[in-house]
């Protein structure tokens, strides 16, 4: 895992904006560990990954492992 972030109970709107910024700092293919307690995260994080092209490697709410997309 190249980086991780505990987003706590941050709402998904703010969460995905910050997540986008944090993933942009990683190299292609690197892994990011996210902890998100927001009740909408189990639906929102997978949907965001599909829309942005990042790969959701594992999900066990509240922990999500995301692989940054290739450029």
Q: Predicted regions span which residues?
A:
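Domain-level signature for proteins that mediate thiol-based redox and metal-cofactor handling
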Residues: 1-71
């Amino acid at each position: 895992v190249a980086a991780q972030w505990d987003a706590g109970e941050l709402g998904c709107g703010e969460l995905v904006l910050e997540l986008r910024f944090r993933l942009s700092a990683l190299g292609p293919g690197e892994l990011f560990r996210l902890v998100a307690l927001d009740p909408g995260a189990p639906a929102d994080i997978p949907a965001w990954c599909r829309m942005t092209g990042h790969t959701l490697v594992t999900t066990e709410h509240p922990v999500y492992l995301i692989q940054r997309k290739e450029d």
